[in-house]
């Protein structure tokens, strides 16, 4: 399934977009392949200047990939900021990572 996701990404890049909207790009992928997807998405952004708008529930993925994160909870904006700001935001920790 990971190879199919990579093929879909390659097909999307054929049109030379300025932005890609990715809805859970790592969903259903073997955890060992997720890092490869993340690396390729980072390369797409850094080398080709393509903006990535990623909808993702896997916090590890989004923390590795994003420069700016918007967290929603129950359909409302919960927090926004850098990965460091998000992982240290008590509201996000309570909602997504479990209260500490």
Residues covered by each model-derived region:
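Helical segment within the ABC ATPase nucleotide-binding domain
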Residues: 35-47
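Conserved catalytic motifs of ABC-family nucleotide-binding domains
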Residues: 16
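H-loop/switch region of ABC-family ATPase nucleotide-binding domains
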Residues: 56-57
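A short, surface-exposed alpha-helical micro-motif characterized by mixed small hydrophobic
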Residues: 62-64
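Hydrophobic anchor residue at the start of the ABC signature
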Residues: 1, 9
């Amino acid at each position: 399934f990971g190879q199919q996701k990579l093929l879909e990404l390659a097909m999307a890049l054929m049109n030379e977009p300025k932005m890609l909207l990715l809805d859970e790009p790592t969903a259903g992928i073997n955890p060992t392949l997720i890092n490869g997807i993340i690396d390729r998405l980072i390369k797409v952004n850094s080398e080709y200047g393509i903006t990535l708008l990623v909808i993702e529930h896997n916090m590890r993925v989004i923390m590795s990939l994003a420069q700016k994160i918007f967290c929603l909870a129950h359909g409302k904006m919960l927090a926004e900021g850098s990965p460091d700001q998000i992982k240290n935001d008590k509201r996000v920790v309570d909602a997504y990572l479990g209260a500490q």
